[in-house]
Amino acid sequence: MFNKLSTPIHIIGGGLAGCEASWQIAQSGIPVILHEMRPQKKSEAHKTGQLAELVCSNSFRSDDSSTNAVGLLHTEMRLAKSLIMKAADANKVPAGSALAVDRDGFSKTVTAALENHPLITIKREEIQEIPENWPHIIIATGPLTSPKLAKAIQTITGTEALSFFDAIAPIIYTDSINMDICWYQSRYDKIGPEGTGKDYLNCPLNKEQYEAFVQALKNAEKTEFRDFEKTPYFDGCLPIEVMAERGLETLRHGPMKPMGLTNAHNPTVKAYAVVQLRQDNKLGTLYNMVGFQTKLKYGEQVRIFRMIPGLENAEFARLGGLHRNTYLNSPIILDQTLRLKQRPGLRFAGQITGCEGYVESSAIGLLAGRFAAAEYHYNCPCLPPLTTALGALLNHITGGHIVDEKTGRKSFQPMNINFGLFPPIASASYSGKRLPSKEKKLAKKQAITARALNTCIQWLINEEKNKL
């Protein structure tokens, strides 16, 4: 057991990830100094000086661990003795199958736990630079990282490694795409760095379908930017609904252009417009809608995007969005244990690494804390298996990405936990008979979660053995 006179691990940022990392490290017997600028300096979104303040919703989403990916992540984090999950459970409010919390009670519980821990010191101050004489650091400053610290991070990581605007296109589960309508083909059959000439899925629209789609976009309900998100649009990242409003033909000369594509199902008929889907992960279980960043309300996205031929039954792993964010190009600059490759004493955690959501941010904080603690004790960090929710999310951040056809660099966008991040599992059957589609989907999810919990328990056992 160390004491407060031992060399501490410095954690910058008192949000969900920073608090979880602090707890995991302190619980392993290592002193922590947690730096939080509030209330000395307020952010554009926070209202209080409490640690782990919930800025937006009070929901941690579904708590169903057998058929829901985020519910599975809840359970894995509970198994790993997560402070955030303990505080959420202690402050839960009625919300059906979801885990929702009293936001004030939740933040106070987390704050009290950290303030009362004998190995945690909380310093209310803004960190504007990354000190060279701190040997162990975790940066968990979230999507609203202060400008001076963001500049310091850019200096260390390189200017292209930090994004300030989050353009997200919807992502679709591959097995929900109608392959009787869609076909594989790259435009003009071009082969990219890791391509085959058939790297995109294509959804054809005739003139009538295209015009109805454009009109639906123009009439749809949009989500407005929050005050602290008001960043001007730039032409390379226009929401599709904004493009639709610029003219009827704008989209078919932009992301929906049909040139260089031939419908494999009907080669003699030229599509009037085409929506392209691009593989989003190495597993091939997810495809994103190319150029479809949007601020449409979620319900509108589902309704309108299912108008696209081939996507009439599409299931979405993530819906689109366009908002201010601060996140790293993590697959390029971080190693498997969330360390900056060029400065191994510096780790990143939470939303700044490229995860989305309260639970996901907390989970990456948990892993960063455990990895840092293992190294401090001169042990090799034990990575969670890819078959666990923790491992699948970590893999998304540090390596589960494909090379961008145009730039040759790994493409990377923030992501919530979803079943598309997990390795596939064999189709479920019952007594040798194949299940109906709906039952098959349910059985598949149950098989993935059962496998995940078994491997998570074994991972935690192995991690304990690693400490000996």
Curated annotation (Swiss-Prot):
Coiled-coil intervals, chain numbering: none
Q: Which UniProt keywords apply?
A: Cytoplasm, FAD, Flavoprotein, Methyltransferase, NAD, NADP, Transferase, tRNA processing
Residues where FAD binds: G13, G14, G15, L16, A17, G18
Give the CC-aspect GO terms. Answer: cytosol
Q: Where in the cell is it found?
A: Cytoplasm
Reaction catalyzed: uridine(54) in tRNA + (6R)-5,10-methylene-5,6,7,8-tetrahydrofolate + NADH + H(+) = 5-methyluridine(54) in tRNA + (6S)-5,6,7,8-tetrahydrofolate + NAD(+); uridine(54) in tRNA + (6R)-5,10-methylene-5,6,7,8-tetrahydrofolate + NADPH + H(+) = 5-methyluridine(54) in tRNA + (6S)-5,6,7,8-tetrahydrofolate + NADP(+)
- Kinase in keyword set: no
Give EC number(s), comma-separated: 2.1.1.74
Pfam families, alphabetized? GIDA (PF01134)
Which terms under GO biological process does the entry name?
tRNA methylation; tRNA wobble uridine modification
What cofactor is needed? Answer: FAD
In alphabetical order, the GO MF annotations are:
flavin adenine dinucleotide binding; tRNA (uracil(54)-C5)-methyltransferase activity, 5,10-methylenetetrahydrofolate-dependent
Function (record text): Catalyzes the folate-dependent formation of 5-methyl-uridine at position 54 (M-5-U54) in all tRNAs.
HAMAP family with a match to the protein in the record: TrmFO
Query: According to its UniProt record, which protein family does this protein belong to?
Result: Belongs to the MnmG family. TrmFO subfamily.
Q: What is this protein called?
A: Methylenetetrahydrofolate--tRNA-(uracil-5-)-methyltransferase TrmFO
Q: Which organism is it from?
A: Bartonella henselae (strain ATCC 49882 / DSM 28221 / CCUG 30454 / Houston 1)
